[in-house]
């Protein structure tokens, strides 16, 4: 599997297998994400996408296979260790702290990603580097003006942007985005697409998304997962023209005519 010319893979997966009893969730998965590219992972519900992301992030262990971040094997590392090595993740369901302000969430994320241990927020706010880092990640997604706003007062789209900002804490090399447009309205979706597009070149992104318009607007490359196995990987144009992909996921011409 090739990566973009002149770039090295920030993430390399080889031979990843994961079974739950008789159910094989991932089957010999191989995938590469180049530094700075947006690589979309698509497939029908139950295809194994989230299971694969959990293996990359470290919340589940594969039965076999290799996971390399910037050339280094990380399969033996814990989630906190992988985060410190350069992995950020946003989740399908928002996991921000609703009882805190936007900046408090960002400071906590910066402290956690940089290995800091703060029992209370006051010591964290006494560290200028943490506060500066927190404001930087908020500005990267355009919500620095909401820094002092309680999270409970944010609109849904703003919460999703905050979640993206928190995933950027610690300046990761790889960002795992699990349906960042979930639950968003048309305007919020377009805004999120623009924010993610501006991250291109700064961080490698593995994007899981059911919104095909967003996928084909954002992705440099697309990998299609069906029943835990990769059935195709290529440019958006190559994937859109792939008959097997259309039949398995996007819908065949016969289905469209039915």
Predicted regions and their residues:
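Glycine-rich phosphate-binding loops of nucleotide-dependent enzymes
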Residues: 2-258
């Amino acid at each position: 599997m090739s990566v973009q010319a002149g770039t090295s893979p920030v993430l390399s997966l080889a031979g990843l297998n994961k079974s739950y009893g008789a159910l094989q969730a991932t089957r010999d998965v191989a995938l590469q994400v180049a530094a700075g590219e947006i690589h979309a992972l698509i497939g029908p519900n139950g295809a194994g996408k989230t299971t694969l992301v959990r293996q990359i992030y470290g919340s589940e262990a594969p039965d076999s296979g290799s996971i390399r971040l910037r050339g280094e094997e990380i399969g033996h590392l814990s989630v906190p260790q992988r985060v410190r090595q350069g992995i950020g993740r946003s989740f399908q369901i928002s996991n921000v702290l609703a009882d805190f302000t936007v900046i408090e969430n960002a400071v906590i994320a910066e402290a956690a990603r940089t290995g800091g241990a703060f029992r209370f927020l006051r010591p964290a706010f006494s560290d200028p580097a943490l506060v500066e880092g927190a404001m930087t990640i908020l500005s990267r997604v355009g919500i620095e003006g909401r820094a002092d706003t309680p999270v409970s007062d944010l609109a849904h789209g703003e919460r999703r942007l905050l979640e993206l900002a928190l995933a950027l804490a610690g300046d990761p090399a790889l960002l795992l985005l699990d349906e960042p447009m979930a639950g968003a309205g048309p305007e919020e979706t377009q805004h999120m697409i623009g924010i993610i597009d501006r991250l291109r070149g700064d961080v490698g992104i593995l994007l899981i998304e059911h919104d095909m318009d967003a996928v084909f607007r954002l992705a440099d490359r697309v990998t299609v997962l069906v029943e835990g196995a990769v059935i195709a990987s290529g440019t958006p144009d190559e994937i859109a023209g792939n008959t097997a992909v259309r039949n398995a996921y996007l819908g065949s011409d016969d289905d469209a005519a039915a």
